């Protein structure tokens, strides 16, 4: 059985609330650059964080963070590059995080219980030069 379509958006809302409670300043959600998207862009002190959120109802097909494949990482990096190009000072310290939300129980259109795991610096930009 596939998870409801609203599950991803609900997981992103949970992640944004979690980050705000941890002192992060949310700058943008669902930022799009061409066909690439970043779920959450936030400031952690002076560090600009590009955050991918993965929500699952079980770990039957692996940990949610495992679905952030090298291809998905490249898409996030492309979107981050577009975001940075629009800043007055694009030479800020950046970090790429993944937040995994494992939903324990669901209501009609919400997640009632969940576990959350924040993987800071989950991947880095490799020089392909």
Swiss-Prot record:
Pfam families the UniProt entry points to: UPF0102 (PF02021)
GO molecular function: nucleic acid binding
InterPro entries: Restrct_endonuc-II-like (IPR011335), tRNA_endonuc-like_dom_sf (IPR011856), UPF0102_YraN-like (IPR003509)
Family (UniProt): Belongs to the UPF0102 family.
PANTHER family (alphabetical): UPF0102 PROTEIN YRAN
NCBIfam families given in the database record: PRK12497.1-3 (NF009150), PRK12497.3-3 (NF009154), YraN family protein (TIGR00252)
Descriptive protein name: UPF0102 protein Cpar_0015
Source taxonomy: Bacteria, Pseudomonadati, Chlorobiota, Chlorobiia, Chlorobiales
